[in-house]
């Protein structure tokens, strides 16, 4: 066999082997991905919607709205929801479960859809009869 004929046989053999490996690869890929659409939601499946429930409205109403007094605090206090510093006469709520302070508009909006503090996630409904105050603790130096 001459050199050109041998080269043609090699090329055809290489192409045939490459085609076989490619076909095997595609079959394996199709087999491996066969059940991957099981996680998709089909219209016939029923969906269970989990709805976040907010705080009991009576508990929210029991948390008084107070006017902030900056002179009562040695450090500036910031609302962690809106990231603004409290200024004198800002209306605020102090959550009874953790004593975190927020502008009352933001607190009310949050608590209509969640029952925890937006800062520390403590349950706000746990301590309903807590006395609320924005004055500093007299025992803290």
Curated annotation (Swiss-Prot):
Zinc finger (RING-type): 79-121
Enzyme class name: transferase
MF terms (GO), sorted A to Z: ubiquitin-protein transferase activity; zinc ion binding
Main location (coarse class): membrane
Compartment(s) of residence: Membrane
Ranges that cross the membrane: 14-32
Domain notes: The RING-type zinc finger domain mediates binding to an E2 ubiquitin-conjugating enzyme.
Lineage: superkingdom: Eukaryota
Membrane topology: Single-pass membrane protein
Originating species: Arabidopsis thaliana (Mouse-ear cress)
InterPro entries: ATL10/ATL72-79-like, Znf_RING, Znf_RING/FYVE/PHD
Protein's recorded name: Putative RING-H2 finger protein ATL62
Protein family: Belongs to the RING-type zinc finger family. ATL subfamily.
Record EC number: 2.3.2.27
